[in-house]
Each structure stands twice: as structure tokens, then as C-alpha cells.
């Protein structure tokens, strides 16, 4: 009977001393309860997302120093510790010429490292280095594949099972690092190679150990269970999966780590699972290879998507960790009365005391009494600070100033008969550029020039602001003037309340509602915003904190008479349909290959075949949303152009967001600012449809 423990610690990226102390506390506890094997996550000393800090040799040296201290902690005990850390080879270089580094897994026992005499290093080297989405491990690490090729060895010789001594006798583990278990689309299968290598030597593996740094996304735990359950049955071996909690970021995307460490028996059953987002050490007994799964009880209603409770926990946990990490104590939220600001306020209210939360309503003449009352109700229900700061006067002042101050067009000075000596290296410089260069260097450059001055008089023009320009001024006045000013006054920060649907097509104003220190719901689709609001009222608050009116009112920016919510006027989006369409653009669908995002050609061909409802997962036929093929095509082209147009520039300048989906904006989705592209097949399909309608 082996007692193992999951060291599901909170990992602070780049903070070696703090992570070391967390590990030592876990080690002390594991010793106190007579643990045989304590398992920590991947790169638990350094953190996974530390950017190019990996290039700094002193940082690497400190990683190795603390790793040695962990090894020493096993001296004079019966405790074996498995932990992730960087490994190096001082005599070799990475492909970029930097110090050779490995994403490594160490096994320590009796004060020293446990290794296989046939392995080249006293640690296990990660083989599959992900280089997709926001992952880019080959930037810093060398894989076991390269080591095998350098040494002219089979990959199976590089990483092998390890046998440790326990109070119950010899115990053999197969150490695996994160992606090395997710090998479906790779040519190499590290776990299979290790198991087959053991069989070839008549060696029995008692436990497969996967140490991961695996961030939360919607449905991620279901995917983990499916993978490890299948592998446990395939290899007829229990699997211990260990992950950490905390948040880490690459600047634009903030990853939330949920932990959810788990033990799987040979039947693939989940026999132990550490609760999500808990910084804890969880001991468990591995008595034999077969366990009985424990029953679970669901509190969800049929109308609540199954992932919503965990999504709420992830966002709440992310907010708490991000505020602690940045030291921000006071939060300012623009409360419009709509659902987005209401949900954001509700989320922050579960983390902050009410005295640290400021809700600000900033009405103009276009805001209805209904939404103003809803903003007031929200603040009253939360019990936080509330202020009303009308923007009409400020907006009118800005508009009046912009339309009353003239622009003067000066006459253009032109040059003719220009003869100058241009060095060969400067042959590509345009004439206008060389004119400027020569005029500023008349004492050193030989040239002759005849100057002509345009005799036209100066002209004066005045700006005439469009309705759209005036709408954007309102949004910028709210964020850049009022919210930023209040945040500065209370020594806090103001939020961006945007959602993923809006970000997809740029339905937001730069330096306006797109501003803020963090977009908590920036990776949450609008329909899920509503689902989260209903869930929080029913299960978290158990009362109506988010006013029902904010859930029921038509979504609207209320920036003009054309967006009058009292007349049922609002956003130009049918969220039930457009969420499904935009998700296909950004993430793909459950019916496509991983990372296969759909184009207008895919959408239109499915429409032509009558399969679009199935492809997008629509709850109604397409005819419910559009009355004609023409209308459907115009809508598709409008939003595809928006998605690939100015919306890209807006997303580049948007605040950081929590990554919770299959594909988030930021570094998770690499984007260039290009002209919207329509495939040739799209034009052919479009012609057929329009001819036949």
C-alpha cells in the first residue's frame, strides 16, 4: 500500500523563493503524514510562463540551486519527491545558440536524484514541446527528440521508467511531462514508448506520473478525464496527474490554472480528484490497481450549461489572483444598467469588500430612466459606492470645440528642375525625401534647385462631426475622462466590461469602452454572459443581485436615438446566432478538426447544403434569423469584413484578458492587420446561391 500525495501548490511565475517555500511547506506536511511519494507539477519552481526570463543565466542558476535544496529535503526520510524544473547541459547549446535547456522532471529520494543508468541525464526530458496557440516551448527548450538524434539513440533510450525504494519495497514509475501524454497528433508517443520499453525488459510499471502546467479552459477537465482514463485502461496502469493553481500570463493573455489533480485506476475511473483552484496537498492511498469511483451530485438545472459553474469559479479565482499580483485594491466600474457591466460588477463583488468597489453611472440624454434605475439597483444590491456623473456637458464642450476651431491649409511649396548628387546607397529614397535631405544639407551637398511657390491663399475649414463620431466621443468621455479620473483619485483601476462577441467584430470604441486595466469577460461570449448572470443570482448570491431588468433589457450602447431601449432598439447583433457564427470564425466548432477555424466559404457551403444549423450548433433554422439568402450573405460579409478589418487593430490595443476558451484573442490567436480575404470557393458558391434564389 503506497501513500502518494498531490502537491497542488500555487505557482508564482518568476518567484523562485516563494515557490520554494510553498514546496517546503508541502514537503513538511507530506513527511508528517508518512507520505511515500509527493508529486509536484511541471516547472513548479520557476513557473511556466516567464517569457524570455529563460535567457537569463542567473535565473537558471537559481532554479538549479532551489532544485538541489528540494533534493536535499529527501535525505534521511522515506519520502520520494517528483518535481518539475529546468535542466541544463553546459556543454551544449540550443538551436539559437543559447545555453542548452530542457523542460525536465526530477525524481529525488534519499537525498539524491533517482536515474536510470542508460539515460544521458539524471532527469526526464520533455519530448513534445508545444508550439501552437500561446505555447512556444521550442523558443527556450530542447526536446528529447533532438537529444536522441544527437546521440544516435532511439528515443526510448532517452527517457525510461525509474524504480524507487519505498517502505513497501521497490516501486516503478513512468515519469511524463504534460504534453507528452497529449500525443494524438504527434509522430512520437512518449508514454507508449516508455511502457513498451518496460515490457521489453519484463519490467512492471506501477504508476504513470504526469506532471503538468495545464491552464483552465471551458471543458478542459472533461478532456483530461477522457485522455487519462483511456490511457490508464490502454496501459493497464494507474495514472497520477498533478497540476498547479494560480495565474500566469504572457502579457496579453492571462491563464488561470485550475489544478484538478486526479488519480485514475486501471479501469479508467477517477478515484481521487483534488478540488479546482485549491492550493493544497492531497494524500491518497494506492492500495491496489482497482478503485471504485465515488458518486457525485450535480446541483445544476437543465437550463444552465454544464461549464458555467466552473467558468464562474475560474473568473472569480482569476480576479482574486490578478488583484493580489498587481496590488490593486480599489476597482471602478462604469455601470450602464446593461448586462455586461452588471456581470462584471457582480464578479468583482465576490472578491472585493463593498467599500473597495465603485460603480459609476454616466448618463447622456440618450440613456433611459430604465437603465439608469437598473444601474442604481445593482449598486444598491451589492452595497458598494455609487456615483452619477452625467457626460452631456463634457461631450457638448468637446463637440463644440472640435467644430468651432479651424484647420488652416497652408500653400504648398514645390520644387522643379532639381539636380543633386545622390550616393548610390540612397538610390531608393523617394524624391520628396531627398528634397528634404538636400535642403537641410545645402552646405555639404552639390545641387541646383529652382523653387516655385504656390500663389494660392491660405484656406480655412471646419470639422463637421458625424453621428458616429459623436457616439464615439461619448464612449471616450466616459472612459478616458471620468472613469480614469475616478480610478486615479481612489488609487485604483477601472475595468473593461467588453465581451468576446464585441471584440470579434470590433463593436467597441478605442480609448472608450475598449479601455481598462483588465477585460475579465473578454473571452466570454455574450450568451454565456447571460448564463453567468443567471447562475450567479441563483447559486452564488441566492437572490437577485444582478437586476432581472438588466438581463431582460435589449442590449444597447444607448449612444443615439437609434439605440433607444424603450423602443426595443439596440445592438446590430442577434447574439443567439452571431455567437455561434463568430465562434466558428475564432475557435472552430465541435464538428471541425482542432484549431480549424471556419471561413465564409465553409459557412456558405454549409448553408447551400442545408447543414449550417448542425455545423454551428444553432437552436433555430437559419430562416429564423434571415428572411432571404441575400440578407444572409450580406450579414456574413459584413461581419467577416469587420472581424478581419479595424477590429484587429482594436484587439491589438485591447486590455489583457483571462484565457478561458478554445481560442482567445491576444497571443493565443496570432493576427496580422491585413485586407479581409474571401476564398475563391466562396465567390463560386455565392454566385450559385444568388442565381438560384
Describe the residue ranges of each PLM region.
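ATP/NTP-dependent adenylation/nucleotidyl-transfer catalytic domains that generate, transfer
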Residues: 171, 236-237, 248, 266, ...
